[in-house]
Curated annotation (Swiss-Prot):
Documented effect of changing residue 88 to N: No effect on sterol binding
Taxonomic source organism: Mus musculus (Mouse)
Result, substituting residue 113 to Y: Loss of sterol binding and reduced response to SHH
Subunit structure: Homodimer. Interacts (via C-terminus) with protein kinase A catalytic subunit PRKACA; interacts with free PRKACA subunits and the interaction leads to sequestration of PRKACA at the membrane, preventing PRKACA-mediated phosphorylation of GLI transcription factors. Interacts with ARRB2. Interacts with BBS5 and BBS7; the interactions are indicative for the association of SMO with the BBsome complex to facilitate ciliary localization of SMO. Interacts with KIF7, DLG5 and SDCBP. Interacts with GAS8/DRC4.
Name the record gives this protein: Protein smoothened
Domain FZ, chain residue ranges per copy: 69-185
Name of the coding gene: Smo
GO MF term set: cAMP-dependent protein kinase inhibitor activity; G protein-coupled receptor activity; oxysterol binding; patched binding; protein kinase A catalytic subunit binding; protein sequestering activity
Extracellular side: 33-237, 287-318, 384-406, 477-528
Amino acid sequence: MAAGRPVRGPELAPRRLLQLLLLVLLGGPGRGAALSGNVTGPGPHSASGSSRRDVPVTSPPPPLLSHCGRAAHCEPLRYNVCLGSALPYGATTTLLAGDSDSQEEAHGKLVLWSGLRNAPRCWAVIQPLLCAVYMPKCENDRVELPSRTLCQATRGPCAIVERERGWPDFLRCTPDHFPEGCPNEVQNIKFNSSGQCEAPLVRTDNPKSWYEDVEGCGIQCQNPLFTEAEHQDMHSYIAAFGAVTGLCTLFTLATFVADWRNSNRYPAVILFYVNACFFVGSIGWLAQFMDGARREIVCRADGTMRFGEPTSSETLSCVIIFVIVYYALMAGVVWFVVLTYAWHTSFKALGTTYQPLSGKTSYFHLLTWSLPFVLTVAILAVAQVDGDSVSGICFVGYKNYRYRAGFVLAPIGLVLIVGGYFLIRGVMTLFSIKSNHPGLLSEKAASKINETMLRLGIFGFLAFGFVLITFSCHFYDFFNQAEWERSFRDYVLCQANVTIGLPTKKPIPDCEIKNRPSLLVEKINLFAMFGTGIAMSTWVWTKATLLIWRRTWCRLTGHSDDEPKRIKKSKMIAKAFSKRRELLQNPGQELSFSMHTVSHDGPVAGLAFDLNEPSADVSSAWAQHVTKMVARRGAILPQDVSVTPVATPVPPEEQANMWLVEAEISPELEKRLGRKKKRRKRKKEVCPLRPAPELHHSAPVPATSAVPRLPQLPRQKCLVAANAWGTGESCRQGAWTLVSNPFCPEPSPHQDPFLPGASAPRVWAQGRLQGLGSIHSRTNLMEAEILDADSDF
């Protein structure tokens, strides 16, 4: 150290004067050169004295300021090159280097400092400082002190030194070591050794890509925590599971579309939207396998890893993939909550006519599409989208796990709680219906309830399992991420050979990353995500789906499907009633039913229960004979009854018009009505086809029915009982007479009870046919329906 070297300043001048005198007398150029300090040491030129080394002639240096120099013992340079650049002077001193006592030791320290070559921006500014301290210019027993500006220029780019080891005391920018405004010869040296980045860092001029405290270098695009073989293994894994998920969800979507008219019913149609979300998400995962797409997605133009997206200087490929994957994932999990809620409310309404989801579907869509949109916009606003070469996509929180916890785990955890609550309540509702009301359930409905409870249980178990796996894998990442970053930083420093302050000559050990994430955990995490999509698609793995595709194939190829169809009774009767006019002309005509009339559960079997009707379906083969059944029951009449009221009618005003039809009543009712006829005028029978003949007999007049009737159709032939209008004298007992209109019968030419002079009494039927009105009255039809309600058609 300089403190151990006594310097006798006054004795130096006579000694130097004596040396100059000897030089002039002897004329030895070699010795003069040696004394001038411009050679590196003994050599052939100085030994023989026959040759001379030319010294470049330079302009005299400016006078050294008093505060810019310090007295020192000058030594001839043993190494005239500092960090690859030639020095323009021949003498130096080790006074300023506090960790070196000789030029050899100073040279060894410079070799260690040369590890900063792997930090390009730091290396560009620290080279002059190191040469000015370890190999300063020394002349006339005074050493030049480097300026404070030269020292401070290294603080920013070389922050890694301060962070890792700290600056030595003699390199701290203190005024006694680095005075202000001092020129230095080293500042004029052009250092031609450019810095480079050691793998896994790459050179970049983008400040956003710089690795922390290593300006000019960024992390390479390929994740250094995983090997190349692990990258290939993970990519094959993603390709396989992504393809399976995409195909399963695509099959589900196609099944719904093939039978959309029957499948577009809540809550089953919610599974269509859930599978659509997972299908779009799988497309985002598989996009990396297009030619050159993965590098475009996860890498920046300078070859560094993407993080902190979106940025204005890069393409939108990373952001697009993030939006596709994240938005689809969040929309899918929100739809899952809506699905469990719809199941819960639908099961509660079983056995009633109440439609709990009516009017709520718009709110379902508003919630499921807007909430993921808000989360996506929030992530893009805070610029926390990062790329990952292992997964091949861009996602939130690869760099900062706190954002991944807030934008991924928090929504999924909330979905698990809410969806699990509704799912458990739905299963409990089904179990309660089955246990407490066994008599209300048909065998088919009970079987559907058992099947649905089993499927809901399996589905709930898978959902809880996949969410638990996702949380476990993320917590594994969160708890170990700091250790992985530390291990990677040590690896970077080892590769850069930054060993500041460790004066050792031991060989540098092999650099390796000691702690790395497990590839198996990453695979399990991806399996949970892809497995959720596959589980959502299993709801259409039913026999009903096979029937749908069979009908679709027959429809596309033009072949007929000979399998008997199941048709709802209500649809069948409505079909026959709508064609009553055609069937009246041709009673043997068969009804044709389109595929849209056919009743089936849709692709999601087991979610539609009919607890009130034990046999809601009938065979399509039997349905072809529905015309005979309708005719036998009197549903097809010569009059238009298409608007017959279904509720209790309100009695109209008592006036004769086309909407009131006379009907025969029982004798008991006739007696009661006879008293009222004294207080009101007798009414004449109205016949729409011809004027009613004037009545002159004293027979009891049928009372006006209070049931509203439709206008009569034109006169048509039909069968009526002859004894309802005449006596046995005019026709045989039990014989039938063909009349034009049962409501306006044609009188017999021998005797007509409505013509003047007719004295035959009316014959009223007794028993089941007695006391009833005409054969086509509303009362007669209703009783016939009640009596034949249990008959087999």
